[in-house]
Design a protein with these regions (language model features):
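C-terminal cap/substrate-recognition subdomain and adjoining C-terminal extension
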Residues: 48, 55, 64-67, 71-240
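A metal-dependent, Asp-based hydrolase signature
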Residues: 2-95
């Protein structure tokens, strides 16, 4: 039984993924219901382990063109009050709107003033995080190639596929490229690309995409998801 709340134009592969997900959750003892939603599936998966749920939180965007996703991000950011997420049996879950705190902007500005390169390593979908972290509209202006998160395959209109992490390896830089009209027409798929950036995977991402030997001099985080990355910081350099 598939969730009632999904975009009609979602990636066809998402239907196949959902069927696998239903079988998996059923085997775990969940009584799936007609009015289950993408959010309730996420909760079911996180009941097993958060590492199981994080990938679904990225895959649910399959089928979106990047320009569509950017419009959704802007709408969410401009939303006032709590976001009402649909749950089974006509129930709703209230979720606070994400925000950037003044202290975060101050810290980033201070680091830049002292010639420290600032990166973001997130357990969220990389494309979503980049749309906020790199867009000057939101006040952080992190270079888009320095935003690392969960990567899903991207499909181009001509049928070719790529992934954001490979663009980083190829040396693609700047918002002129990442937010270009051509790239914004690419569509998200369902297939993930390693390393997956949660828990110990954040350290793997640092090694893979930032530096294989030098450690960060400072790591900031707000959840147990960040502990591995925080303990990886170079303590001999007075890191936090």
């Amino acid at each position: 039984m598939l969730p009632a709340v999904l975009r009609a134009e979602a990636e066809p592969a998402l239907d196949y993924l959902l069927k696998q997900l239903v079988d998996f959750l059923g085997a775990e003892g969940h009584a799936l219901r007609e009015h289950d939603t993408p959010m309730s599936y996420y909760d079911y998966l996180c009941d097993i382990d958060h590492s199981v749920g994080y990938l679904w939180a990225a895959q649910v965007f399959a089928g979106y063109q990047l320009q569509e996703l950017r419009a959704e991000v802007r709408a969410m950011w401009n939303h006032t009050g709590m976001i009402q997420a649909p749950m089974p049996k006509n129930k709703w879950k209230e979720i606070p709107v994400a925000q950037i705190y003044p202290a975060q902007k101050e810290l980033i500005a201070y680091l830049r003033a002292n010639n420290v390169d600032v990166w973001i390593v997130s357990a969220s979908l990389e494309e979503v995080v980049r749309m906020v972290a790199s867009d000057p509209e939101y006040g952080l202006s992190i270079p888009p190639e320095r935003v690392i998160g969960v990567n899903l395959m991207l499909k181009k209109p001509n049928g070719d596929s790529t992934v954001g992490a490979l663009e980083r390896r190829e040396g693609k830089k700047g918002i002129e490229y990442y937010f270009s009209k051509e790239r914004m027409q690419w569509k998200l798929g369902t297939y993930p690309f390693a390393p997956l950036t949660w828990y110990a995977g954040k350290v793997a991402a640092i090694l893979e995409w930032i530096d294989p030997s030098d450690r960060p001099i400072l790591v900031a985080g707000d959840s147990p998801n960040d502990f591995y990355m925080q303990f990886y910081a170079a303590a001999d350099q007075d890191a936090i």
